[in-house]
UniProtKB/Swiss-Prot annotation:
Plays a role in the inhibition of host innate immune system by targeting the CGAS enzymatic activity which is the principal cytosolic DNA sensor that detects invading viral DNA. Acts by inhibiting CGAS-DNA phase separation: directly binds double-stranded DNA (dsDNA) in a length dependent but sequence independent manner and is able to form DNA-induced phase separation in infected cells. DNA phase separation of ORF52 mediates disruption of liquid-like droplets in which CGAS is activated, thereby preventing CGAS activity. It holds the Pfam family Herpes_BLRF2. This is Tegument protein BLRF2. Residues 118-162 are annotated as: Disordered. GO terms for biological process: symbiont-mediated suppression of host innate immune response. Residues 151-162 have a biased composition (Basic and acidic residues). Its main location: virion. Residues 12-43 form a coiled coil. It is found in: Virion tegument; Host cytoplasm.
Length: 162
Protein backbone atom coordinates (compact mmCIF):
# COMPACT_ATOMS: atom_id res chain seq x y z
CA UNK A 1 0.00 0.00 0.00
CA UNK A 2 1.46 3.34 -0.96
CA UNK A 3 1.46 6.45 1.17
CA UNK A 4 -1.07 9.11 0.27
CA UNK A 5 0.38 11.50 -2.26
CA UNK A 6 0.75 15.14 -1.39
CA UNK A 7 -0.83 17.58 -3.80
CA UNK A 8 0.74 20.98 -4.07
CA UNK A 9 -1.63 23.63 -5.31
CA UNK A 10 -0.20 26.50 -7.31
CA UNK A 11 -0.59 29.90 -5.73
CA UNK A 12 -2.27 31.44 -8.75
CA UNK A 13 -5.03 33.95 -8.24
CA UNK A 14 -8.37 33.23 -9.90
CA UNK A 15 -8.06 36.50 -11.84
CA UNK A 16 -5.02 35.21 -13.75
CA UNK A 17 -6.78 31.99 -14.81
CA UNK A 18 -8.88 31.76 -17.94
CA UNK A 19 -12.35 30.26 -17.94
CA UNK A 20 -11.08 27.08 -19.63
CA UNK A 21 -8.30 26.67 -17.04
CA UNK A 22 -10.79 27.08 -14.18
CA UNK A 23 -13.18 24.56 -15.77
CA UNK A 24 -10.35 22.06 -16.24
CA UNK A 25 -9.17 22.56 -12.65
CA UNK A 26 -12.74 22.17 -11.36
CA UNK A 27 -13.16 18.90 -13.28
CA UNK A 28 -9.84 17.59 -11.95
CA UNK A 29 -10.72 18.53 -8.36
CA UNK A 30 -14.16 16.91 -8.66
CA UNK A 31 -12.61 13.67 -9.91
CA UNK A 32 -10.05 13.72 -7.07
CA UNK A 33 -12.84 14.36 -4.57
CA UNK A 34 -14.83 11.43 -5.96
CA UNK A 35 -11.78 9.14 -5.76
CA UNK A 36 -11.07 10.20 -2.17
CA UNK A 37 -14.69 9.60 -1.15
CA UNK A 38 -14.54 6.10 -2.63
CA UNK A 39 -11.28 5.46 -0.78
CA UNK A 40 -12.86 6.55 2.52
CA UNK A 41 -15.89 4.32 1.89
CA UNK A 42 -13.56 1.36 1.27
CA UNK A 43 -11.88 2.02 4.61
CA UNK A 44 -8.77 3.76 3.35
CA UNK A 45 -7.25 6.68 5.17
CA UNK A 46 -7.67 10.11 3.71
CA UNK A 47 -4.84 12.51 4.47
CA UNK A 48 -6.90 15.60 3.64
CA UNK A 49 -9.63 14.75 6.19
CA UNK A 50 -7.30 15.20 9.16
CA UNK A 51 -5.90 18.56 10.14
CA UNK A 52 -2.69 17.08 11.59
CA UNK A 53 -0.50 15.10 9.22
CA UNK A 54 -0.56 11.49 10.40
CA UNK A 55 2.25 8.98 10.34
CA UNK A 56 1.89 6.19 7.80
CA UNK A 57 -0.06 3.25 9.16
CA UNK A 58 2.24 0.24 9.63
CA UNK A 59 1.21 -2.95 7.87
CA UNK A 60 -0.47 -5.61 10.02
CA UNK A 61 1.91 -7.65 12.13
CA UNK A 62 2.49 -11.09 10.60
CA UNK A 63 1.26 -14.04 12.64
CA UNK A 64 3.90 -16.59 13.58
CA UNK A 65 3.12 -20.31 13.67
CA UNK A 66 3.41 -20.33 17.47
CA UNK A 67 1.04 -17.36 17.87
CA UNK A 68 -1.41 -19.04 15.52
CA UNK A 69 -1.37 -22.26 17.53
CA UNK A 70 -1.78 -20.35 20.81
CA UNK A 71 -4.81 -18.51 19.45
CA UNK A 72 -6.36 -21.73 18.13
CA UNK A 73 -5.80 -23.47 21.47
CA UNK A 74 -7.32 -20.56 23.39
CA UNK A 75 -10.38 -20.43 21.15
CA UNK A 76 -10.85 -24.19 21.38
CA UNK A 77 -10.58 -24.07 25.16
CA UNK A 78 -13.11 -21.27 25.49
CA UNK A 79 -15.59 -22.96 23.17
CA UNK A 80 -15.12 -26.34 24.86
CA UNK A 81 -15.71 -24.79 28.27
CA UNK A 82 -18.87 -23.10 27.07
CA UNK A 83 -20.07 -26.32 25.39
CA UNK A 84 -19.39 -28.37 28.52
CA UNK A 85 -21.56 -26.06 30.63
CA UNK A 86 -24.40 -26.19 28.11
CA UNK A 87 -24.19 -29.98 27.82
CA UNK A 88 -24.25 -30.40 31.59
CA UNK A 89 -27.31 -28.14 31.87
CA UNK A 90 -29.18 -30.08 29.16
CA UNK A 91 -28.27 -33.46 30.67
CA UNK A 92 -29.43 -32.33 34.12
CA UNK A 93 -32.73 -31.08 32.65
CA UNK A 94 -33.32 -34.33 30.78
CA UNK A 95 -32.77 -36.53 33.86
CA UNK A 96 -34.65 -34.27 36.26
CA UNK A 97 -37.06 -36.36 38.33
CA UNK A 98 -35.48 -39.74 37.51
CA UNK A 99 -35.35 -42.00 40.57
CA UNK A 100 -34.03 -45.38 39.40
CA UNK A 101 -30.75 -46.46 37.88
CA UNK A 102 -32.44 -48.20 34.92
CA UNK A 103 -34.39 -45.06 34.00
CA UNK A 104 -31.21 -42.96 34.24
CA UNK A 105 -29.22 -45.37 32.04
CA UNK A 106 -32.02 -45.58 29.48
CA UNK A 107 -32.36 -41.78 29.21
CA UNK A 108 -28.59 -41.22 29.00
CA UNK A 109 -28.17 -43.97 26.42
CA UNK A 110 -30.79 -42.47 24.10
CA UNK A 111 -29.83 -38.85 24.73
CA UNK A 112 -29.20 -36.67 21.68
CA UNK A 113 -28.13 -33.05 22.10
CA UNK A 114 -27.55 -30.18 19.77
CA UNK A 115 -25.78 -27.12 21.13
CA UNK A 116 -24.51 -23.90 19.68
CA UNK A 117 -21.46 -22.07 20.99
CA UNK A 118 -19.81 -18.89 19.84
CA UNK A 119 -16.86 -16.74 20.83
CA UNK A 120 -19.25 -13.93 21.74
CA UNK A 121 -20.51 -15.95 24.69
CA UNK A 122 -17.08 -17.27 25.73
CA UNK A 123 -15.57 -15.96 28.93
CA UNK A 124 -12.12 -14.42 28.99
CA UNK A 125 -12.17 -13.21 25.42
CA UNK A 126 -9.40 -10.63 25.03
CA UNK A 127 -10.06 -7.39 23.30
CA UNK A 128 -8.14 -6.84 20.06
CA UNK A 129 -5.47 -4.71 21.73
CA UNK A 130 -4.67 -7.12 24.58
CA UNK A 131 -1.98 -9.76 24.61
CA UNK A 132 -2.57 -13.39 23.78
CA UNK A 133 -1.29 -14.66 27.11
CA UNK A 134 -3.84 -14.63 29.96
CA UNK A 135 -1.29 -13.27 32.42
CA UNK A 136 -0.57 -10.31 30.14
CA UNK A 137 -4.22 -9.48 29.61
CA UNK A 138 -5.22 -9.73 33.29
CA UNK A 139 -2.29 -8.16 35.09
CA UNK A 140 0.20 -5.99 33.21
CA UNK A 141 2.58 -5.97 36.21
CA UNK A 142 2.74 -9.76 36.51
CA UNK A 143 6.09 -11.39 35.95
CA UNK A 144 6.68 -14.55 34.02
CA UNK A 145 7.46 -17.79 35.75
CA UNK A 146 10.93 -19.23 35.39
CA UNK A 147 11.31 -21.94 32.79
CA UNK A 148 11.17 -25.47 34.09
CA UNK A 149 14.44 -27.32 34.44
CA UNK A 150 14.94 -30.93 33.57
CA UNK A 151 15.22 -33.14 36.65
CA UNK A 152 17.94 -35.12 34.97
CA UNK A 153 20.27 -32.15 34.67
CA UNK A 154 22.21 -30.70 37.48
CA UNK A 155 21.82 -27.00 38.12
CA UNK A 156 24.82 -24.93 37.08
CA UNK A 157 26.72 -23.49 39.98
CA UNK A 158 27.62 -19.87 39.56
CA UNK A 159 30.63 -18.50 41.38
CA UNK A 160 31.00 -14.81 41.89
CA UNK A 161 34.57 -13.64 42.14
CA UNK A 162 35.55 -10.36 43.72
Amino acid sequence: MSAPRKVRLPSVKAVDMSMEDMAARLARLESENKALKQQVLRGGACASSTSVPSAPVPPPEPLTARQREVMITQATGRLASQAMKKIEDKVRKSVDGVTTRNEMENILQNLTLRIQVSMLGAKGQPSPGEGTRPRESNDPNATRRARSRSRGREAKKVQISD
